[in-house]
Amino acid sequence: MTTAKLDAAPAAGREFDPVATARSLLRAARRASLATLDRAGGQPYVSLIGIASDEDGAPLLLVSNLARHAANIAGDARASVLAAEIGAGDPLAHPRVTLFGRCTAVDKSAKKARWLARQPDSAMYFDFADFHMLRLEPEGAHLVAGFGRIVDVAWNELRTETVDAAALFGAEPGIVAHMNEDHDDATRLYATRLLGAPDGDWRFEGVDPLGCELGLDGRSLYLPFPERVTSAADVRRMLVRLVGEAKAGDAAG
């Protein structure tokens, strides 16, 4: 259940969707703060990590066995991840979400393509034997999206259903490659016209049933789809539709 913590209303004319806001923050996050319990004394310990989202939106973490947080998690799997939108001005004016749960080990090789599409700079050490992959199994989330927008979000609301989307995820690497090789102009339109991002060589990083991820120079954005997709054909139709919407908006402007 989603529970509002403050009674103040959102800004007039803007509909606040806490689930969509939290989901976009997590899908777009490429770096985050990881909080664990120190193995030596039990104190809270916070470190900076790179992250990517799993198919259902849960965070994936690539961790070195030498890292202190790796030892902490080995002793107590409880952890939380803070993902924040970075921008100018007061950092507390920008939305952020904390996801908490327990870390479990996952097959690193099975997540390699997914990880490197979102964290390409880690390719040089991804296969090192002392690096392993963890997945935070979420139990809930806490979103701070501005004054009057402080909300608890249950994981069963936030997670992306994947049961009917095996075909989509099987095709995802090919979709990403095709978009970057043949349709970089479309990706640029999505970022600049639909998300209001600065112009640049935006790249397509990933897709799921509810949206797609776009990246430029270490920054990523999440573009929600107006309706759910579950196959490569669905994705193609959706991306063509969004190009039309982007061009129509450009012409109207």
What are the roles of these predicted feature ranges?
Residues 1-253:
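Binding-site signature for planar aromatic cofactors or substrates
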